[in-house]
Amino acid sequence: MTGWRSRDEGFAVRLGRLALWAGMTLFGLVGPVMASPADRLVPAPLEATLSGERTPGRDRFVVYPPSRSGPVMKASVARFETRMKKAFALGDAGRAISVRIDCACAPGSGFGLGEDEGYAVSITRSRVRIRATTEVGVMRALATLFQLAQRDEAGLSWPLGDIRDEPRFAWRGLMIDVARHFQPIDALQRQIDAMELTKLNVLHLHLSDSEAFRVESRLYPRLHEVGSFGQFYSQADIRRLVDYARERGVRIIPEFDLPGHSLAMIYAYPMLASAPVPDPPWSLPVRRNAVIDPTREEVYALLDDLIGEMTALFPDPHFHTGADEVNGIEWSASAPIAAFMKQKGFETPEDLQAYFSGRMHGIVSRHGKTMIGWDEILAPDLPKDVLVQSWTSSKMTGLAARAGHKVIVSAGYYLDWLTPSSFLHTRDPLDLTAQGLTPEGFDRVRGSPLERLISERFVIDPTLRMTPEEEGRILGGEAAMWTELVTPEKLDATIWPRAAAVADRLWSRPEATLVPLDERLEAVSEHLESAGLRHVASPQAMQGRLTPEGGKVVATLLEALEPVKFYAHNHESRSGGRAPLQSFADLADALPPESLPARRFNRQVAEYLAGDRSLADVLRDRLTRWRDNDASFQALLARNPALKDAASASSDLARLSEAALEALGRLQDRSLRAGRRDARIDELVRTHLAHQAASADAIASFIRPQPPGDVLLAPFDGLRALIEAGG
């Protein structure tokens, strides 16, 4: 389905962009020979001049921090030393490279919004030197050095040269929804470690929703005793997590979603309700419709107390109050609320929400915080100091900035959509057409069941522009990790390494490097794994439980599969709440959102078709493995019923690989005449084009039939390109 500008612009554009990169490589503009080690960094630095030589190989390194280092600086150096020793198997004896840090850093410097995070690194044959003006700047430099380090038979080394770096945007965040699925403290700590390594600096915790309220409240204990359903963070947990993040240059922003998405709070304290709520389990419509009553003063008294208690736990000056997806059904059905609206002269539920937002702004401000809200909070009378977080479309970024608000961009950065890193990376915060529904697409939604979920705010306005002053109000962005389908075991792999693509977009200048993103992410993925992230290990463990036998055979197939995209695997949302509960342990759940090996194959096909015939053997080996794997995989099915959802994917991969091998042979030897292509292959191509189309955008993912097992053939673009090129 067309009409939603999202995943990509189609097969021709995807292959064309890859071919363009390939052509640039062939003609010497970029490529393995000329690319600097800095070109493979994530995020890419502002300026880097590296010679191609490296420091002499050594057995170890020694860091010399500033003489007046505070506890944060000392902890940063200690983490760097630990990570380096673990990643490169370094000891404490032998010849050493010296790493000297020059920083007259005040304790706590660089943590605030807009404070200096810049640094410079100079690497000579005799030493590495870091210069920064803040403690956080030193952390960013150490993250860069960790990625640049290399160990071979000669020993540990770094590339010679100079780097000067600073972020493009001040706000570079990751939002994690801990309400839908509770995420343990150690899981959040792993994400903070990864954020430090990729230079993200804001962890936004979505702490309450209709499913649960997740923080201990001593003033209103039923919120966590009843509303958490047994899983919550104690106040001591929160304080430890805030300290843990601060040591790593990460600020934590709390979000308590109000007035909608509040069923758990209402269930704990029914006096908050606009309408009575049933006992759980709650259907999807009940969760969507529940909303706090904004007309009663006792509601604001409770919220004032609660916000005062919560702001004391989170020292950051920002406090998020949610404000998204308030449908107003309960307000419209309530006679007392209707009378209140008439008294105040409010004509719509949006007017009442604007009133609530104004009251919340007063409460948050009295507690010394700056309020943040999702873009539904935008209203003519909204105080200008409220930060707006755009999510419905890129248009809302421009409208909020035009209205005088500072903006955090999440439109297009939804990790739960399971879109590839290239999708995330191409969404620029300043591009007001980057994400959203086209006007034509909006017309197609009218009259469908989706119409009640879609409004004009989701629609792109191609005429909208920002002035330089308005662009200056864009603080940055946040990758958003909503967890309806994400258990703690799935958290790392659903976020990483794709979140590094968002980190790169928010830190680096556009087109800062021409080294392919998938190649850069493969490298950073290894660094994240060595630092303790479980984005590789957890999917492997889940796959192992699905089938305890078949190791290499199963792995060969699964590297070619990805889960369907957007909302296609969310059976509850697709069915309007009528689908049975999901297990979160099916084959699609055990797959990472993106197969980097398959994406690499697609890129290599584009490079080959652009003229790099040296890749023929690499492609032939991969295609042969995929073709020959199917017989062994089909033999496993009788003993491993959990794999049945992948049966057709395996056979289709084998057939397409065979056709691609034949095409590759003809491309290599033009004397081989192309015969008439098997009609069954053409039909197979059409089938998988339909599978792709069903995941092409959010709207399609709701309404189109999905492939068996909710899985896609990730190398399909490359397979199709070879088949078509070979005649």
Identify the role of each PLM range.
Residues 324-339, 343-346:
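N-terminal leader/propeptide and maturation segments of large enzyme subunits in energy/redox metabolism
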Residues 112-320, 334, 359, 363, ...:
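Feature activates predominantly on carbohydrate-active enzymes
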Residues 19-29:
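Bacterial N-terminal signal peptides
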Residues 33-170, 371-374, 378, 382, ...:
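Acidic, contiguous N-terminal accessory segments
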